[in-house]
Amino acid sequence: NNDGTCIAIKRINLEHISPQLLKEEPLLQLNYHSATYIGYGPFALIPKTLVIDENYTTFLPLENNLRQRAKTIVNPLTNDILIAAYSNQWTIPNIKCRKYHEVELLATMALNSHTTNTMWAEITPQRINIIVIHDHKLQLANSYHISCDNDAAYYILACYQQLNLPQEEVELNIIGDLLTINPVPFLTDYIRHINTPQPQNWNAELPNQYAPLFTLQTKL
């Protein structure tokens, strides 16, 4: 609603928005003050020193139609470039949406956390997106295919090891679909500080287990 409180949740698993869904889904028939589309797709973190010209999309092995969808996010602290492209851009005829890439939002949230060193992980049923902040700067942005709790835990711990992050000190913030894949119980034996940040203005009347699904959306 107008104060940002979540008043309705509906989860629909699909590969594309069909004409039938557009006609039959009640939530898509309403008028909204604002709407947000969060997409996914290939992305890369590019050190500024490697960039010769402004054609950042050449760093992504994409077809031309996907390159045209690419969005560039420049880290204001280092001028390093995070470039992301949408795999698809669904449109809903009667709803005008602001479009964001999920990694863009995750990186922005991590950089705005005001924590010197931290890791952020977003879980989906098919992948885990990992952002690492070191000295308030974006050190890592990567995505890995996962299918179970152990996969997610493996990639998180591998990032700690490869980047020499002290597991007793560097906190892990984990959000996303923890109902489907949840490595937190396993990771508590290895990482001292694990947080599951809650969405802003979360409605106490809604089931709390759904909250991590919407942390990114409510940080916009």
Where are each of the predicted segments found?
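Hydrophobic/aromatic-enriched cytosolic interaction surfaces used to assemble or bind macromolecules
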Residues: 1-220
